[in-house]
A protein has these predicted regions:
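Second-shell loop/turn segments in exported
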Residues: 23-28, 37-41, 63, 67-68, ...
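Substrate-binding/active-site groove segments that recognize
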Residues: 70-90
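Export/targeting segments at the very N-terminus of extracytoplasmic proteins
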Residues: 1-60
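Amphipathic alpha-helical interaction surfaces
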Residues: 56-59, 83-86, 114
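Stable alpha-helical elements in mature extracytoplasmic
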Residues: 30-34, 38, 46-50, 81-84, ...
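Secondary-structure transition/hinge residues
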Residues: 42, 88-89, 116
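Catalytic cores of secreted/periplasmic lytic hydrolases that degrade extracellular macromolecules
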Residues: 13, 19-20, 25, 114-129
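Secretory-pathway/luminal and periplasmic proteins that interact with or process carbohydrate-rich
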Residues: 58-65, 115-120
C-alpha cells in the first residue's frame, strides 16, 4: 500500500512524478471502502491499480450506470458492458447481476488474470501509466 508520495519520489525536482503519485493516491482514497473486497480477489501488487480502475470507471459507486451511444449500458463498480456480461454470465455461471459489488469484483479479477487489464483500456488515460 502506498504510504506517501514523498517517500516514492526521489527528488523534489521531479514534480510531475509527485503530481502523478498524488492523483493516483487521491483516486485510491475515494474508493477505500472497497479495498477489503479488492484485496480478497486481487494479488497484492494489483490492488492499487484495481482501486484506480474502480475510481475511474464508477467513482466507487456500485449502482453506477453509463449509457453508450450504441444503446448498451455499462453497469456497476467495474462498468461491465451489456455485451461483456452476456458473454461472461454463462461462461462463469454468474447468478448475480453487475450491481453486486462482490460478484463484479470476482469477475473483474477473473478477467484480469485470464485475459489482462485491457478490458478497461477506454479509461486507461485515468488509471494507467
Amino acid at each position: 500500500m502506498l504510504i506517501s508520495c514523498t517517500l516514492t519520489t526521489e527528488t523534489p525536482a521531479d514534480f510531475s512524478q509527485f503530481i502523478s503519485c498524488r492523483k493516483g493516491q487521491q483516486q485510491v482514497n475515494v474508493v477505500q471502502d472497497w479495498r477489503p473486497l479488492v484485496e480478497k480477489y486481487f494479488k497484492p501488487q494489483d490492488v492499487d491499480r484495481a482501486m484506480r480502475i474502480i475510481f475511474c470507471e464508477s467513482s466507487g459507486r456500485s449502482n453506477a450506470v453509463g449509457k453508450n451511444t450504441n444503446g448498451t449500458k455499462d453497469v456497476g463498480l467495474w462498468q461491465f458492458n451489456d455485451e461483456t456480461w452476456r458473454w461472461l454470465k454463462p461462461k462463469l455461471k454468474i447468478q448475480d447481476d453487475r450491481f453486486d459489488a462482490e460478484t463484479s469484483t470476482a469477475v473483474a479479477s477473473w478477467l484480469v488474470y485470464n485475459d489482462g487489464w485491457f478490458h478497461w483500456n477506454s479509461s486507461k488515460h485515468c488509471w494507467g501509466k
